[in-house]
Amino acid sequence: MFSTETIERLLKVIPHNELYSSPIKGLFLRHSDQPFCYEGIIQEPSICIVLSGEREVQLGEQCYRFDNQHFMFCPVNIPMRGEIKYAEPQKPFLVMSMKIDIESVSKILLANPNLADDVQKGDEGFAQWHLDESLKNAVERLLLLHENPKDIEFLASLIQQEIYYRLLTGEQGGKFKAMVSNGSHTKKIAQATHYLQQHFNETITVETLANLSGMSLSGFHSHFKKITSLSPLQYQKSLRLMEARRLIAQEGRGITEAAYQVGYESPSQFSREYKRYFGHAPKGDTK
């Protein structure tokens, strides 16, 4: 658990009620003193740690709750929704997200061959992990660099290396290593998710994705669901609906036009699935 003192020190040096892109590479912080929802984001490979408050994440039909003792590990790009139900000025919500630098993790494994054991062990992908004291301390030191920005250039990368080391040597090490290990299920599924993001508005069969990943059809489907918490169809549908919402809400496109542009053949089916996913009809997002 992060101390009240640490939270107060951070709140003095980061912007309030917005997503803050830190000068520390790959690090983002989000503060809020009121509840809010995020209805469609692509979470890149990262760890996300709630410093204060609680966060709910929705993946398909599953809901995960994260607090300051349990953090989120996202090994591949995953579309997700979420909600912060409780936040107020006296008890604000504060979360950090740190993108995982695959190259840095690979270098640590190359320099320490003994860490490369049991790469496949517990290869389950998206996960909720306990935040142990050694990892918490490293994260705390990284965040408090914001008090002395001149230290960031030299110290931030060193502390991030320590964070990767703690993840590699912790109880979750096998799953974390699978991200960067050639031949691991996580690495293969990452290829499929990348392809889906590039071709989400096309008709794609699961057989095509399985062949692309070099896996059997049944094996691919099983591991895709384990690693992303979504089926391939749910994953593609999430990408389509999120892009459609952006087209409607931000670009002012018509509902039917957006439906066809993201790959739907039936506007009525699109409207039904949009309402089921976001909780309201597409017209609720029109300008």
Language-model features and meaning:
Residues 117-133, 145-202, 207-213, 226-234, ...:
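Short, Lys/Arg-enriched, Trp-marked, Pro/Gly-tolerant hinge/linker segments that flank
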Residues 82, 108, 166, 235, ...:
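Residues that scaffold the ATP/ADP-binding catalytic core of kinase and kinase-like folds
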Residues 19-117:
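N-terminal regulatory/effector-sensing and dimerization cores
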Residues 69, 220-224, 269-270, 274:
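Short hydrophobic/aromatic patch on the recognition helix
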Residues 193-198, 202-215, 225-268, 280, ...:
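Terminal helix-turn-helix DNA-binding modules in bacterial transcription factors
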Residues 46-49, 104, 134, 138, ...:
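Amphipathic, well-ordered alpha-helical segments in soluble domains
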Residues 1-23, 36, 119-123, 145:
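A short, N-terminal "cap"/entry segment at the start of jelly-roll beta-barrel domains
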